[in-house]
């Protein structure tokens, strides 16, 4: 070797240096995990909103009661939710839905902590469909009675009572609106679970 020549020596990169390097671009799996975690957080927030709407509907209907300030010797004019089986069914159904949604919160948290877990999402998907069906049935049945209370039905001689029982009708109408808010949120939850399961 001549004195003017320089020898190049390749030094292998140490494992410590190699471990210190992090990829600048996230892998597809990491991106999918972040997307599913975002869906899980949105699912949890929607459930909180549905709980508020369902319990508000049950409480409003369950406390709806109005007594007119005048009465006769034999009659006292009163309107209450328990006078109608449809409204009683509504209160029971919405209370059950509210209870289910509260119990579903831990499973929703699992989907946030473990975004790739299929079993909790599938369970919530099935139970949300059942809850959606029950809520829709209760809300639709109560809405029919509220419509008759506001407008009556001349063909069957059913008289409108909301001119006399204004506060009662306002409360039951608000309860029905809250139930349909719950329906919309449950529909969103079902669609959300479907998207999350499709991404698997």
UniProtKB/Swiss-Prot annotation:
Residue ranges that the Swiss-Prot or TrEMBL entry lists as coiled coil: none
One GO BP annotation of this record: cell wall organization
Entry membrane topology: Multi-pass membrane protein
Chain ranges on the Extracellular side, renumbered to this chain: 60-86, 143-171
Cytoplasmic membrane side: 1-38, 108-121, 193-200
Transmembrane segments: 39-59, 87-107, 122-142, 172-192
Entry-linked InterPro entries: CASP/CASPL, CASP_dom, CASPL
Subcellular location: Cell membrane
Cited Pfam families: CASP_dom
Domain of life from the UniProt record: Eukaryota
UniProt keyword terms in alphabetical order: Cell membrane, Cell wall biogenesis/degradation, Membrane, Transmembrane, Transmembrane helix
Family stated for the protein in its record: Belongs to the Casparian strip membrane proteins (CASP) family.
Quaternary structure (record): Homodimer and heterodimers.
Role this protein plays: Regulates membrane-cell wall junctions and localized cell wall deposition. Required for establishment of the Casparian strip membrane domain (CSD) and the subsequent formation of Casparian strips, a cell wall modification of the root endodermis that determines an apoplastic barrier between the intraorganismal apoplasm and the extraorganismal apoplasm and prevents lateral diffusion.
Protein name as catalogued: Casparian strip membrane protein 1
């Amino acid at each position: 070797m001549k004195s003017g020549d320089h020898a190049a020596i390749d030094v292998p990169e140490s494992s410590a240096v190699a471990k210190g390097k992090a990829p600048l671009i996230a892998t597809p799996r990491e991106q999918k995990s972040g997307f599913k975690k975002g869906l899980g957080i949105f699912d949890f927030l929607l459930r909180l909103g549905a709980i508020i709407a369902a319990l508000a509907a049950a409480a409003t209907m369950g406390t709806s009661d109005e007594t007119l300030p005048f009465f006769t010797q034999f009659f006292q004019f009163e309107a209450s939710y328990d006078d109608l089986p449809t409204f009683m069914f509504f209160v029971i159904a919405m209370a059950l839905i509210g209870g289910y949604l509260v119990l579903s919160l831990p499973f929703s948290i699992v989907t946030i902590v473990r975004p790739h877990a299929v079993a909790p999402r599938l369970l919530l998907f099935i139970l949300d469909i059942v809850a959606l069906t029950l809520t829709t049935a209760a809300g639709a049945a109560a809405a029919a009675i509220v419509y008759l209370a506001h407008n009556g039905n001349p063909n069957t001689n059913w008289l409108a009572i909301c001119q006399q029982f204004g506060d009662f009708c306002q409360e039951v109408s608000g309860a029905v609106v809250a139930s349909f808010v719950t329906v919309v949120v449950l529909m969103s939850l079902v669609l959300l679970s479907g998207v999350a399961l499709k991404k698997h």
